[in-house]
């Protein structure tokens, strides 16, 4: 395994109110071990957006990086799909 491998996640922007920061909601699905039902888990991440190019509703890709603040450990890689409207 590569030493500097970093997590790359995809999710939807749910907030862009902060300067150069977006809040991204990442949803994952896992099978329950006993009941075999597919369960949805979601988690919010703060990500650095230097050019303020992502807006609410956009589908984005974020990558793990060094800590940029107390809660911000990801940065925006690209906007995959723009929100309609």
From Swiss-Prot:
Pfam (any one): Ribosomal_S17
A biological process term (GO) from this entry: translation
Keywords: Ribonucleoprotein, Ribosomal protein, RNA-binding, rRNA-binding
InterPro entries (UniProt xref): NA-bd_OB-fold, Ribosomal_uS17, Ribosomal_uS17_bact/chlr, Ribosomal_uS17_CS
Gene Ontology CC annotations of this record: cytosolic small ribosomal subunit
Signal peptide (from-to): none
Molecular functions (GO terms): rRNA binding; structural constituent of ribosome
Organism superkingdom: Bacteria
Quaternary structure and partners: Part of the 30S ribosomal subunit.
Family: Belongs to the universal ribosomal protein uS17 family.
Function summary: One of the primary rRNA binding proteins, it binds specifically to the 5'-end of 16S ribosomal RNA.
Designated name of the protein: Small ribosomal subunit protein uS17
